[in-house]
Design a protein with these regions (language model features):
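Conserved, well-structured interaction surfaces
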Residues: 40-49, 53-59, 84-163, 179-187, ...
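Long, intrinsically disordered, low-complexity segments
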Residues: 83, 117-118, 191, 257-322, ...
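An aromatic- and glycine-enriched ligand-binding surface/loop that stacks and positions planar moieties
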Residues: 21-87, 197-198, 216-373, 494-496
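C-terminal substrate/ligand-recognition segments
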Residues: 340-442
């Protein structure tokens, strides 16, 4: 069995050292070991476990989606203002500005996943071939093949959402060829659908989100993937399968991201420091004051939510707040209406005075957490440039004095997303009434309880309501940037704008001055070519049947 070094694989792919065909070449393995593995179900399960470590790469705790940090940092939602770490602070800004870094080679380094993903596809196909040659019962073969095909479907989904086309390989290893053309986009999505349908039909039905994959996980991924190819009937079909499985929204929004008592999670990946599977999300994004209060050097706050995102949240009674008073470059002493905003705001964003770890957040100049001006102030480390910090997904109980590694789970799929996927498919089928009903299910979570939507009677109005709900409900779950791309609105929404924050100064007593500031040195820019990422040069060098996409030539 090979040892898995996924970080090394990503680095190698990012540096252009590998092509997919290098990974797909069949190399010698220990035949005795492989034979033993596929002669026993329990050891075969251990072999399949290899792929589970890739599930978190769907989301925000790793750098698979973007080697330079959260993809939200490429949008109006999040600002990387900390200059301590070049790749995770400077680079996302350059990508969002479409700076000189957006050559085909550098785009592949920071956004591409070609080489590492094809390596995993090759390994899945090898495993399926060995499984088919085993003497396992039909039931065990079907279950293990379903797990493997879930992963293959997941890998091809990640390729197609970036490149629109892929080279399709299956478990017939004789088809591997150094020179092989890209298959059509339609063929690629049909292949993803086939794998995920098989997985959904053959994995066990269970609401246990921990451990091995379930039918619900397969259908959840299917509902997400089919949005990208606009197969609305299959989105609805996948969602409806999940609706009958017994998942429920957690009453408290923040509980949807926790391990215990989570009725909403369809699949979560759990970390364990003993098994050395922790992550660094808290170290990167916790408020800077958390580190100093633990007796450490100021750190954290690599990126922070923007004022633009804050203004997306509704009042607890419904409708948007009027932020005109705080859109002043002269400054105002009036406190922002944080206490009037809906519960999801309080569960997602830390603001001036927010309760946190037995203290209150101080994102003001010379506060415990601090404020700094983007690209102007020295030693920004740990300080916010927007006046906010991220709360969602950050572990309030993490002890930095004990460990820099964190263990809160990554919830890969949850019911609220499925409701919104279903709503989108319904409105695309002109069923506005059902679409609005499922958006309202999310809005009326017991602990959120926003008013039902009113006067949303057209497809266009329902789509705007859906866009708002996805932006708020699914914030920082790694979906917003890709939503803008698949809707073909990124070029419009992410061009010619700048992100904003609040500069906060403590005055006398408990009074503060809030000043509206721009936190970008230039406009954001999403060039049309970014709707499809470039083929890596390493692939072009070795595969004579592939040409670079026209927009990247």
């Amino acid at each position: 069995m090979k040892t898995k070094y996924i970080v090394s694989c990503l680095l190698a792919a990012a540096m252009g050292l590998t092509s997919c065909n290098d990974f797909l070449d069949i190399d010698p393995t220990n035949k005795v070991t492989e034979k033993l593995v596929w002669n026993d179900v329990s050891t075969a399960e251990l072999a399949v476990n290899y792929f589970y470590a890739d599930i978190p790469y769907l989301g925000s705790f790793n750098n698979y989606q973007c080697a330079a940090g959260l993809t939200e940092g490429l949008t109006d939602e999040f600002k990387y203002g900390n200059l301590l770490n070049n790749s995770e602070c400077y680079i996302p800004n350059q990508i969002s500005y479409a700076g000189s870094i957006l050559t085909s080679s550098y785009t592949d380094v920071y956004m591409g996943v070609w080489g590492s993903t094809y390596e995993e596809i090759r390994r899945v196909n090898e495993s399926i071939a060995k499984l088919h040659a085993s003497s396992f019962s039909k039931e065990n073969q079907a279950r293990l093949e379903a797990e493997l095909r879930f992963f293959r479907g997941m890998y091809y989904f990640e390729l197609l959402k970036r490149y629109h086309q892929a080279i399709i390989y299956d478990e017939d290893l004789s088809k591997i060829n150094t020179n092989k053309a890209l298959d059509s986009e339609e063929a690629g999505w049909a292949y993803v659908l086939s794998d995920l349908e098989f997985a959904g039909q053959n994995l066990p039905v269970s609401t246990n989100a921990k451990g091995r994959l379930t039918s619900g996980a397969a259908y959840a991924l299917m509902s997400r993937a089919m949005l990208y190819c606009q197969n609305w009937d299959k989105v609805k079909e996948a969602c409806e399968k999940i609706f009958g499985m017994g998942y429920e929204l957690t009453p408290n929004y923040s509980d949807a991201f926790k391990a215990d008592g989570n009725t909403e999670a369809i699949y979560m990946y759990q970390y364990n420091l003993t098994a050395k599977t922790g992550h660094s999300f808290d170290g990167y994004y916790a408020p800077g004051g958390d580190h100093t209060l633990a007796g450490m050097t100021m750190y954290g706050g690599y990126g922070t939510p923007t004022q633009d995102l804050v203004e997306e949240y509704e009042l607890a009674t419904g409708g948007k707040a009027d932020w005109t008073t705080w859109h002043t470059t002269e400054g105002t002493m009036q406190n922002p209406p944080y206490d009037k905003l809906e519960p999801r705001f309080h569960a997602t964003i830390l603001y001036n005075g927010a309760p946190w770890r037995g203290r209150t957040i101080e994102p003001f100049i010379d506060g415990k957490d601090g404020w700094a001006q983007w690209m102007k102030d020295a030693a920004v480390e740990g300080r916010t440039t927007t006046g906010y910090y991220l709360r969602k997904l950050v572990d309030e109980n993490h002890d930095f004095a004990m460990s820099q590694q964190s263990t809160q789970p990554w919830v890969a799929f949850r019911l609220a997303e499925v409701y919104l996927n279903y709503a989108e498919a319904c409105l695309r089928k002109n069923d506005v009434e059902t679409a609005v009903a499922y958006i309202d299910k999310v809005r009326q979570r017991q602990g959120v309880n926003l008013p039902k939507l009113k006067n949303v009677n057209t497809v266009d109005a329902a789509f705007e309501a859906l866009r708002h709900e996805r932006k708020v409900e699914l914030a920082f779950e790694g979906l917003y940037y890709w939503d803008l791309r698949r809707w073909n609105v990124a070029e419009r929404e992410l061009t010619g704008i700048r992100r904003h924050g609040l500069k906060i100064e403590k005055m006398t007593g408990d009074t503060f001055r809030y000043t509206y500031v721009t936190v970008d040195s230039e406009d954001l820019n999403f060039p049309k070519k970014m709707y499809r990422l470039p083929v890596p040069q390493a692939e072009l060098n070795t595969n004579k049947d592939i040409e670079q996409f026209a927009e990247w030539k």
